[in-house]
Amino acid sequence: YPFDFLVENLWWSGLTLKNVRLTRRLIEGMHTQKKGIMLDTGHYMNTTTQLKTPEDAVAYLNKMIDKYEKAQMLHWFKGMHLQLSLGGDYVRKQRKEWREHPIDFDKIPFYELFRLAYDHACHIDLHQPFIGEGVREFVERVAPKYITLEYQQNSRE
């Protein structure tokens, strides 16, 4: 490829970045030299429901990067979607609500189900500006080649 082929982490099973060994296996299995990881900071934050502040998020991200640095894999982090996502309270509330009042998804029309799923994902993956103590230092530590400020808009205005 003439471009960098980057894989983006997610917050559900697959490429969460929580397992260094699995990430190494994926990246080493890609048959191109121009490969790497697009770290979505909000997606990584969504792998826990315990974060309350941007500073909690920075500490959580740095702990993950410590593991990749120790494994000599930090150079694979070539891009970053820089965003804040502290949706843990919503996730805990939804889990409780769905346990108490299960939804029969088979009874919901497809497009309504799509709308509900999209709305649910937007309440988890908040795409807010990531501003706080240590954010700049975190970005400088990772030193990505590409940075996207990835924000969710509530309107077109």
Residue ranges and their predicted role:
Residues 10-12, 152:
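Short strand-loop junctions, especially beta-strand C-caps/beta-turns
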